[in-house]
Amino acid sequence: MLDPKFLRNELAVTAERLATRGFILDVAHLTQLEEKRKSLQVATEELQAARNAISKSIGQAKARGEDVDAIMAQVGDLGSQLDAKKLELAAVLEEVNAIAMSMPNLPDESAPIGADETQNVEVRRWGTPRSFDFPIKDHIDLGEGLNGLDFKSAVKITGSRFIVMKGQIARLNRALGQFMLDLHTTEHGYTEAYVPLLVNEASLLGTGQLPKFGEDLFHTKPATEEGQGLSLIPTAEVPLTNLVRDSIVDEDELPIKLTAHTACFRSEAGSYGKDTRGLIRQHQFDKVELVQLVKPEDSMAALETLTNHAETVLQRLGLPYRTVVLCTGDMGFGSSKTYDIEVWLPGQNTYREISSCSNMKDFQARRMQARYRVKADNKPALLHTLNGSGLAVGRTLVAILENYQNADGSVTIPEALRSYMGGLTQIG
């Protein structure tokens, strides 16, 4: 959520910056609402003051033995007018809040301006795609050939965009998650968390999935015994970031760095026909998430660090990748700046996203009222929040199967994972 004061005082600037994201802000309507809000605020305060003044005169009139019926009627009339104005004001504030909640974050000045993914800017590459001297297979053919990926059973059990993994490929998938967690907790300073896979509406509002992206989520029915509907998490960013919702942490506790390995669930609304085969776009997938909560002045440097943490996973696994900075028109709703890390997939002969690392600045913190106490003046200030995949486990599995495949259909285990695989060097 954007800063309401900045929005009021810099409406034209806000509209101009949001336009680079493809979001058209109705400046005239917001200006009209703001004028109405001010007018109603003044009217409410004047009616309140008038009612208070007349109410005081009732006691004085009674002391003089005067009839107070007329004054009482006047107080009642002012009270009715006041209640009506308060309702009008509340309606205006509710509309302004609804508009504010629908606005994406302002892009950072360092984010390249562009309309869509074709205008993202590559910032670096690591590794060289392998040259094969045999006809390569994609991860689907490899996984099915090794009896490790069972798409047919998943369709029978649930439906499309799900997977059943078996044997050593299931073990490899588990090993990847453990390897990522160990790397981030032992070398990168993150604290591991086990979090709920179901979250409430307030949590989704806090991180920005609601109210705009409810169709992308899976929602539970019936409600819990508390009468509350819940939703499956689309990413562990939601529960991890909401750990500081409605709280004030000490400045000395910062930065807070959290990680979790969870299943994630997405309806993939609007993705009909995209990546219908394989593991690239599933309704249920595993991901190791990285979240940082930092002071505002540290957040841009933290974005670089967090992105490097995600890249380190690919480097340790020997997987070629490139990192791109997203243009304004391709960034996620709550992001002010985002790096996408794209891994090389020989089966598709292209780079595909495997991690998205974003600085949300105070956009989520304002929604969540997540603050820290500044030592200099002992006053609370909004945190900056960052998140990124470190990494998407299923897509990393895809990359290993395709990049480490052999001519006979077997797959070599990357050295970094062999201790997690009981010393196994090859599948198949």
UniProtKB/Swiss-Prot annotation:
Main location: cytoplasm
Gene Ontology biological process: selenocysteine biosynthetic process; seryl-tRNA aminoacylation
Keyword Endoplasmic reticulum among record annotations: no
GO cellular component, one term: cytoplasm
Reaction(s) catalysed (UniProt annotation): tRNA(Ser) + L-serine + ATP = L-seryl-tRNA(Ser) + AMP + diphosphate + H(+); tRNA(Sec) + L-serine + ATP = L-seryl-tRNA(Sec) + AMP + diphosphate + H(+)
UniProt: L-serine binding residues: 235-237, 289, 389
One GO molecular-function entry: serine-tRNA ligase activity
EC number: 6.1.1.11
Similarity annotation: Belongs to the class-II aminoacyl-tRNA synthetase family. Type-1 seryl-tRNA synthetase subfamily.
HAMAP family: Ser_tRNA_synth_type1
Function comment: Catalyzes the attachment of serine to tRNA(Ser). Is also able to aminoacylate tRNA(Sec) with serine, to form the misacylated tRNA L-seryl-tRNA(Sec), which will be further converted into selenocysteinyl-tRNA(Sec).
SUBUNIT field: Homodimer. The tRNA molecule binds across the dimer.
Protein name in UniProt: Serine--tRNA ligase
